[in-house]
Amino acid sequence: MGENLPLLLSAALGKKVTRPPVWMMRQAGRYMKIYRDLRERYPSFRERSENPELSYEISMQPFHAFKPDGVILFSDILTPLPGMGINFEIIESKGPIIEDPIRTLSQIESLKELNPSESLSFVGQVLSSLKKDVNNEATVLGFVGAPWTLAAYVVEGKSSKNYSLIKSMAFKEPDLLHKLLDHFAKSIGEYLKFQIKSGAQVVQIFDSWAGQLSPQDYDIFAGPYQKKVVDIVKEEYPDTPVILYISGSAGVIERMAKTGVDIISLDWTVDIEEACKRIPDEIGIQGNVDPGILFGNKESIKERIDDTFNKIKDRKYILNLGHGILPGTPEENAQTFFEHGKKLTY
């Protein structure tokens, strides 16, 4: 097995590679016509992400189109919630809606422990099929939402601009919030282990809303629970690389490095040279390219990729965007991103 590792997995493990691997967050999705056509036939997001045949088909769409070095499970960070007794729906124009927001002790105490093999068997099926069919031509990636971000959704009840409800809980009833975060950390750790057992070779933790916290509050409500998830995973799978992504992470990069993750995925608001100085050498870096550059012309895309890579040539690096690819991105520009990325050499 050691001789036949796919490129992204090799790079994530710190092995010598000839070029940086390339994939994109949200590489399966609305910018692709083939996805939009499928969405017309299956308008429910939950059906698309929870029906194993559909999730598999969507996960593979960018692989067939662009041959990225990573194939990521098509799912959602909220997908494990029903297995804990929290129902949700995703409305196309509004995003996620939690049917019964979690705001009391009795609600938190009544949450179920997540049993992924029972409530998320479809995820296992998809990852197993991806691993078999991708056949090490690319690395299969799994992912989860981090405890703080999941808590933000379930307390607020939906996406939020200022997170006043969860911050009110954090500063008025911190014990209540810690109880919820702890429940999520244990469940998400188990869910990641299930994904790895099912076929994920690298996993990514999305703490999308941790960038809304001050550094001192990150140390209380986000960092420790990210670390708890990583510790649970590493206890059983010490050699599976874990990536951590936070949107708006410039103020907490050093703190992210203390969570036990192997790779930090950067948004585009931080200078990558500066980030290299702030992140220990043994930790890899992913991303940093502004997804907005994909609305430019081909030359500007190539120049930005070259500029980013030249600043980080001496580090373990995975080429990616600093956020998910945006709806409306021209598919040919995504093609340019992948094609040019594969021409880079160490």
Swiss-Prot record:
CDD domains, per the entry: URO-D (cd00717)
Localisation per UniProt entry = Cytoplasm
EC assignment: 4.1.1.37
Q: What is its main location?
A: cytoplasm
| Top EC class, one word | lyase
Enumerate the InterPro entries for this protein. Answer: UROD/MetE-like_sf, Uroporphyrinogen_deCO2ase_HemE, Uroporphyrinogen_deCOase
Q: Name one GO cellular component term.
A: cytoplasm
Chain positions of site Transition state stabilizer: 76
- Catalytically driven reaction(s): uroporphyrinogen III + 4 H(+) = coproporphyrinogen III + 4 CO2
What residues bind substrate, as annotated? 26-30, 76, 153, 208, 323
**Keyword annotations for this protein?**
Cytoplasm, Decarboxylase, Lyase, Porphyrin biosynthesis
Matching Gene3D superfamilies, A to Z? 3.20.20.210
Under Pfam families, the record lists: URO-D
- A molecular function GO annotation: uroporphyrinogen decarboxylase activity
Q: Name one GO biological process term.
A: protoporphyrinogen IX biosynthetic process
Q: In which pathway does it act?
A: Porphyrin-containing compound metabolism; protoporphyrin-IX biosynthesis; coproporphyrinogen-III from 5-aminolevulinate: step 4/4
What family does the database annotate? Belongs to the uroporphyrinogen decarboxylase family.
Q: Which PANTHER family match?
A: METHYLTETRAHYDROFOLATE:HOMOCYSTEINE METHYLTRANSFERASE RELATED, UROPORPHYRINOGEN DECARBOXYLASE
Cite the record's note on assembly: Homodimer.
List the HAMAP family hit by this protein, alphabetically: URO_D (MF_00218)
Protein's job: Catalyzes the decarboxylation of four acetate groups of uroporphyrinogen-III to yield coproporphyrinogen-III.
Under what name is this protein listed? Uroporphyrinogen decarboxylase
Native species: Prochlorococcus marinus (strain MIT 9312)
